């Protein structure tokens, strides 16, 4: 399906709500997204073996995780309007998300040969309290994907004598091996379940392609660090992440933009 027809048929994407509950020792987070008319998605995140905690203090972090999760579903239709009912955003936050879509989705726009999109964001009135986590330890959360970057980070932290907590999303065999070799006895494991309806839309010819996964990992790592009491998050990103690799419609496309220093700085400022 082409962009013009998709946007005409599906003019509005809605981040309706999120929910979270303790299931055994795990935290189960669900998001409710809708696309008018007739499409809905309910992706799920499961954070395993969490400590005893009060869920209310994590509302803002979970709400923001839903915003980055939302992009994977919005891209199917590129609806020109995104309505945020689950919470509220100020002007600076709206600018952050529009910029993330514009730069972080550059490879997606290029792959699909469509114009750059900057959707209008309509925000709700629900105010989420900004929580200061004062009781964090001085530990370091290290996301592990199984590649050389995370292995380098773990080795550097080990040599520096730093306390490290390994963290992995849908860990592969390589990731599990890396954590074992690094001596991570009890890593934080997170399972992300994509709504199968999105995969069905992909098969039907809706828009599909690159999303800024490292930005997703940044928001998820922040939540995991807060839950498990880690003060810092350490990532190794190659220097080439700061460089674009192709020109498209007058803009430089960087398919690794969410690994760049520019994104890291914007993310730090956003989190403040």
List the model feature ranges, each with a label:
Residues 1-139, 151, 156-197, 201, ...:
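RNA-binding accessory domains that recognize and position tRNA/RNA substrates
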Residues 50-52, 169-272:
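ATP-dependent adenylate-handling ligase core
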